[in-house]
Every structure is written in C-alpha cells, then in structure tokens.
Curated annotation (Swiss-Prot):
The lineage of its organism: Bacteria, Pseudomonadati, Pseudomonadota, Alphaproteobacteria, Rhodobacterales. Keywords: Amino-acid biosynthesis, Aromatic amino acid biosynthesis, Cobalt, Cytoplasm, Lyase, Metal-binding, NAD, Nucleotide-binding, Zinc. Its EC number is 4.2.3.4. Zn(2+) binds at E187, H249, H267. It is an enzyme of class 4 (lyase). It catalyses: 7-phospho-2-dehydro-3-deoxy-D-arabino-heptonate = 3-dehydroquinate + phosphate. PANTHER family: 3-DEHYDROQUINATE SYNTHASE, 3-DEHYDROQUINATE SYNTHASE, CHLOROPLASTIC. It comes from Cereibacter sphaeroides (strain ATCC 17025 / ATH 2.4.3). NCBIfam families: aroB. This is 3-dehydroquinate synthase. The keyword Cytoplasm applies. InterPro entries: Dehydroquinate_synthase (IPR050071), DHQ_synth_AroB (IPR016037), DHQ_synth_fam (IPR030963), DHQS/DOIS_N (IPR030960), DHQS_C (IPR056179). Its cofactor is Co(2+); Zn(2+); NAD(+).
Length: 370
C-alpha cells in the first residue's frame, strides 16, 4: 500500500497529512527535513508509550535524531491545567528552543495538549502530530485547534496553532481496543453526514470491515482528512464553514461535561449520540426527511455504537441541566446557541435560530427512554 498525502492549504503555513502503513517505522526520515538540529521532544501518554514510543524513537535514532519523551497519564482528565503545566515546564527543562520541534505522539488528548503547549512555549514553536487513534487521525490532529478543558467546560482554553506535519500511520490502529476504534468511527461517520452522502453510503457497506481491512481503513481516513482539510482551508478560525465540523458536538460536549469527562462516555461516542440528536432535531423542525434520523441510527446500531442517551451508564442531569451545560459551548454567539443541523444526510448547515423549547423537548424525550 502506498502513502497518501493530503495537503492543508494555508499559504505559508500549509502542511501535509501523510496517511498509510509504516509511517512510525520511518518517522525519522519523514520528520528530519523539518529540523534545524537533530533533536526532538516528544509528549505522549503512558499507554501509547508502552505500545509505540520505543519503535518511534528507534526510527528517529536511525535518522540520527536524538529524542527525549514525557509520558503523561492516559485519559481525558489529563487534558487540564495540571498536566498542561507539567508538559510546558518539562519542555523548558529540556531546553526546547523556538526553532525546535515538539512531537505529539498519541490520541486527541495528547495532540490537543501538546499542540497548545507548543503554541505558548516561547510564543510558539513548531510541532508534528503523530496520531495513534482513529479519532485523532481523522479529526483532532488536522486543522490546528489545540487546547485544554477547564472546570467550566471542554476546550475553552486554547489556541489555533497549525502543525508542520501530520503522520497518520494506519497500522497502529490495529492495536486500538474495539471501543476506542468505534469511538473514532463516530468522527468518520460525521464527515459523511455533514457533506458527503456518497461517503456515508459507502460507509454503510464498508464500515464493518474497517478494523480488519487496511485498504478500506486508509480510504476512510483519507476521505475524512480531505473533507476536513478543504473546510479548514476555507475557514481556519471557525468564523463560518468550519463550524460544520461541530455537527453533533453541542450535545456531545454537554454530555461529556455531565459525565465528568470519564470513560462513561468517550468523545467519539458522544459525537455519534450528538449527531443522532441533531438529525432528530432537524427532522422535528421540518428540515430533513423523516427517514434520515432513522437511517443514521440504524447504521450506528449496526456498528454496535452508542446511539441514545439511554446507552450512557449512570445518572444524567435533567433537560434543563443539559441545556445549562450547552450554554458554555464555544459556538454560543451573543448568548445564543448555534446548532449544526441537516437538510438531509450529507447536507449540514449552521443554524442560529433553534427554538430552545424544542431542544428541551428533544432532550426530555431522550431522557424518558432511560
């Protein structure tokens, strides 16, 4: 299999997302052209370090690149002030200079945290994303959104800081637990829902074999990255079209906050549930065909994914409580929520005039099934 390269066109800050097998094994050769001196600082987590850090550092050494690494605890709870401060202090202790490169080796949590650390360190150093989860490969590693969570909500502190290179090794996805792979699929299916009905139709047939079929997996990752790259090139800082990438995320972020960013609900699982709720809301507003939400839910169920609020273990707030959590969403403008709704599968749009009473009713009905 060959490596695909998708270019994110951002003028002088353009970069490539390289997608294919074996990229970690030749990471040194891939990254070396970016370096002013043969030295790298790697931020990773303890789980990824046990699986991929040794081969990654061996590939760097083969290219004559020295490296040091800090492994943070795995999990969403790491994406906060404490571990962020620890990472920044470590990078300073390692004497990372402004012309050096930081590597984010891991999933979305590490990519977001390491990217933000690179953004603020010495007022900005370059970084390379080496995403090791499906979710990170198709979404969080591309586009330059970096940041951490706070007590007030998810991703409320951060910066736009584009990577210099993304290496998406699809081979490492074979080591992912099934639940994590399916959670990542929540972001893959989102791309079909928001802007490519043909891709969604292909996924309905191909998705069950993504975990075992490298060619299908690479195609799914490539198409997802292509769609994100096109949108980011048009709207880097989310003033318009880029908000489409948040399909399902208004509901998702509230649910993640309600579950304490714990393993009760992984981010991609929340995205899948959020997409289902967004399509249901669209249908209730008379915007999309009645069969669209049913078709989406049927596909998610066939994949063995979480689909409804009843699939989330443990207690949840009532509808009013969830609405209050939504009010902290980054997409709030002038105190009003913006939702990403859909006219059909593959036809999402930004809506600024969604009736709060209808959102409340959708949530009440979903909670009533628990």
């Amino acid at each position: 299999m060959t490596v695909d390269a998708v270019r994110v066109e951002l003028g002088a800050r353009a970069y490539e997302v390289r997608i294919g097998p074996g990229l970690i094994a030749r990471a040194g050769a891939e990254i070396a052209p970016l370096l002013r001196r043969p030295k790298l600082a790697i931020l990773t987590d303890e789980t990824v370090a046990g699986l991929h850090l040794a081969p990654f550092q061996a590939a760097l050494a083969e290219a004559g690149i020295a490296s040091s690494a800090l492994a943070l605890p795995a999990g969403e709870a790491t994406k906060g002030w404490e571990q962020f401060s620890r990472a920044v202090e470590w990078l300073l202790e390692e004497k990372v200079e402004r012309r050096d490169v930081v590597v984010a080796l891991g999933g979305g949590v590490i990519g977001d945290l390491a990217g933000f650390a690179a953004a603020v360190l010495r007022r900005g150093v370059r970084f390379v994303q080496v995403p090791t989860t499906l979710l990170a490969q198709v979404d969080s590693s591309v586009g330059g959104k970096t940041g951490i969570n706070t007590a007030q909500g998810k991703n409320l502190v951060g910066a736009f800081h584009q990577p210099s290179l993304v290496l998406a090794d699809i081979g490492v996805l074979e080591s992912l637990p099934a639940r994590d792979f399916l959670a990542g699929y929540g972001e893959v299916v989102k791309y079909g829902l928001l802007g490519d009905a043909d891709f969604f139709e292909w996924l309905e047939g191909a998705a069950p074999r993504l975990a075992s079929d490298p060619e299908a997996r690479q195609r799914a990752v490539r198409r997802s990255v292509e769609m994100k790259a096109e949108i980011v090139a048009r709207d880097e800082t989310e003033e318009g079209d880029r908000a489409l990438l948040n399909l399902g995320h208004t509901f998702c972020h509230a649910l993640e906050k309600a579950t304490g960013y714990s393993d009760r609900l992984l981010h991609g699982e929340g995205v899948a549930i959020g997409c289902a709720l967004a399509f249901e809301l669209s249908q209730h507003m008379g915007l999309c065909p009645q069969e669209a939400p049913s078709r989406l839910r049927a596909h998610l169920r066939a994949m063995g994914m979480k689909v409804d609020l009843r699939d989330i273990p443990g207690d949840l707030p009532d509808a009013e409580g969830l609405l209050r959590l939504m009010a902290q969403d980054k997409k709030v403008v002038d105190g009003k929520l913006r939702f990403i709704l859909a006219r059909d599968i593959g036809a999402a749009f930004v809506a600024k005039d969604v009736p709060g009473d209808l959102v409340r009713r959708i949530l009440q009905e979903a909670l009533a099934t628990r």
